């Protein structure tokens, strides 16, 4: 069997509703990692939050964080996770986005670098935050209601054509927000950087997801698998749908059958 790159979204996919990677999943991924398959986490989270949520992600060789803006490799050394790819936003871009802040419409603008997240709510000078950051990877803009999110999606896309601006939605509710990244940044881009490093063809990439920011990787990777609990529009774009949810080890149950069949 050819070596596979297995790309895993976290929230709603690998993590259960308690935000935990099950012991069954950890044990299974350790087993297939030893067989030579490349386990890669692909998430919208920053590195720090990814490691907290997965208790160190020992089962993974790579982490694609910030919706594809950065890639880290498990070096099995004291420094552990080494950055091998980054596509960052300029501070000028962040200032321009922040200039639209309106307390009557916005809740917060979350500004992320590789390892931290800072919240801007209009009460301080944006430069006080930017001075603390070196490599800005990702903005998350949260609104008081979904109508404002739709309003600013159209506005920002017209004003900032050089940015990747997407409407996101909670898989377990209807809350919407905007993710803003450098043009061309998406989970699939980060995954392809891992594939290049490992010499793996696209047909040997298996991606799992449940949310709107997983659609492109499910469409573009060789095999796209939507979770049973995924949003309907995500399922429509997938090659397969797991028979079990994220609370029932859906990823593992799928791989146990799929990797045997091929």
Question: Model-derived features: where do they sit?
Answer:
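Short, hinge-like loop/turn segments at secondary-structure boundaries
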Residues: 57-60, 80-86, 125-131, 182-184, ...
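Asp-based phosphoryl-transfer active-site loop
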Residues: 2-19, 218
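Short, structured coil segments at secondary-structure junctions
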Residues: 56-59, 66-67, 159-161, 220-221, ...
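Mg2+-dependent phosphoryl-transfer enzymes with acidic/Ser/Thr/Gly-rich catalytic loops
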Residues: 1-3, 22, 181-262
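A short acidic, helix-capping loop that chelates divalent metal ions and anchors anionic groups
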Residues: 14, 80-81, 173-177
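Conserved acidic, metal-coordinating active-site core of Asp-based
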Residues: 100-208, 212-217
């Amino acid at each position: 069997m050819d070596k596979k790159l297995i790309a895993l979204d976290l929230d709603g996919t690998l993590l259960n509703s308690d935000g935990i990677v099950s012991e069954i999943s950890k044990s299974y991924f350790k087993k297939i990692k030893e067989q030579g398959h490349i386990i890669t986490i692909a998430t919208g989270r920053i590195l720090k939050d990814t490691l907290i949520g997965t208790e160190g992600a020992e089962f993974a060789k790579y982490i694609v964080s910030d919706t594809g803006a950065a890639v880290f490799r498990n070096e099995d050394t004291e420094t552990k996770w080494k950055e091998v790819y980054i596509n960052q936003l300029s501070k000028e871009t962040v200032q321009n986005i922040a200039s639209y802040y309106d307390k009557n419409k916005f809740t917060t603008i979350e500004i992320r670098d590789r390892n931290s997240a800072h919240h801007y709510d209009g009460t301080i000078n944006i430069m006080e935050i930017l001075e603390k950051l070196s490599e800005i990877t990702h903005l998350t803009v949260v609104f008081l209601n979904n109508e404002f999110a739709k309003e600013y999606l159209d506005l920002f896309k017209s004003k900032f054509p050089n940015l990747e601006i997407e409407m996101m939605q909670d898989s377990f509710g209807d809350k919407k927000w905007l993710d803003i990244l450098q043009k061309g940044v998406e989970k699939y881009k980060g995954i392809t950087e891992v594939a290049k490093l490992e010499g793996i063809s696209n047909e040997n990439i298996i991606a799992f997801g449940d949310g709107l920011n997983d659609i492109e990787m499910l469409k573009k990777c060789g095999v796209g698998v939507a979770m049973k609990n995924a949003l309907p529009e995500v399922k429509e774009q997938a090659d397969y749908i797991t028979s079990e949810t994220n609370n029932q080890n859906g990823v593992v149950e799928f791989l146990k059958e799929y990797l045997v069949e091929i």
